[in-house]
A protein has these predicted regions:
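Secretory/extracellular carbohydrate-interaction modules
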Residues: 1-69, 75-77
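Localized edge beta-strand/strand-to-loop motifs within extracellular or lumenal beta-rich domains
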Residues: 115-131, 137-139
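Short, surface-exposed beta-strand/loop "edge" segments at domain boundaries and coil↔beta transitions
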Residues: 7-13, 30-39, 142-145, 176-189
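Short, solvent-exposed beta-strand-to-loop segments that form ligand-recognition rims
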Residues: 139-167
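A recognition module on extended beta-rich or small alphabeta surfaces enriched in W/G with H and D/E
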Residues: 50, 57-60, 72, 166-178
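Beta-strand-rich interaction surfaces with strong enrichment in secreted/lumenal proteins
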Residues: 107-111
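Short helix-loop boundary/capping segments
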Residues: 59, 63, 67-101
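Ligand-recognition surfaces built from glycine- and aromatic
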Residues: 156-192
Length: 192
């Protein structure tokens, strides 16, 4: 799978492609309430399990590791101190996007081809007070493109504590190839 987005020591907002499917990931030390999950199309009363990276969980928001071997819990008061850090994780699949799902049926009429999307953007409010908005820069004609909203994570003033505690997010990307037997060409990530 491929992931790219922004990350700090407490939170991550990421785009992800796994098995050819686009989704959005939110990882945080602060879980979302059921009310917020429902607003974002992840109703725990109707969605009894989720599949994240090939593993099934019996909850919409499991507390799991990010998959990054360098993402270590550095809090000496944590029971997971020194081991891989765990985050409350939600994965929003493309069919749950509240913006343009990029499946040809959204406002843009565009069907996603990740190799043709040249830029992705994530806007967020510090301390999580205004949620996050995810964009794709899609082609609309010969030599033309525009930003479209694919999903808005609606969490306005709904958390019991601050998230995004550090305003200094870093660009983070990961290419995780678990089965190399069918790869015939080198795999690359370009950033600018």
């Amino acid at each position: 799978f491929n992931e790219w987005g922004v990350s700090n020591k407490t939170d991550q907002y990421m785009f992800k492609i796994y098995a050819g499917q686009l989704s959005i990931i939110r990882r945080s030390e602060i879980p979302l309430s059921n009310e917020v999950l429902v607003r974002n199309g992840l109703d725990p009363s109707t969605t009894l399990s989720v599949n994240i990276n090939g593993t099934s969980y019996n909850t919409v928001q499991p507390k799991i590791q990010s998959g990054d071997p360098y993402d270590v819990d550095e809090d000496p008061n944590s029971p997971d101190f020194g081991s891989n850090k765990k985050y409350w994780t939600i994965e929003i699949p493309r069919d749950k996007f509240n913006g343009d799902p990029l499946n040809g049926n959204g406002p843009s009429g565009y069907t996603i081809r990740p190799e043709k999307v040249t830029m992705w953007k994530i806007e967020f409010g510090w301390y999580g007070a205004i949620g996050a908005r995810f964009y794709a820069y899609i082609p609309v004609g010969a030599g033309e493109a525009r930003w479209i909203v694919v999903h808005t994570l609606v969490i306005e003033n709904s958390l019991y504590g601050p998230c995004l505690r550090d305003s200094y997010f870093r660009f983070k990307y990961s290419v995780n190839v678990q089965d190399t037997s069918n790869i015939r060409t080198p795999q690359y990530v370009y950033k600018y």
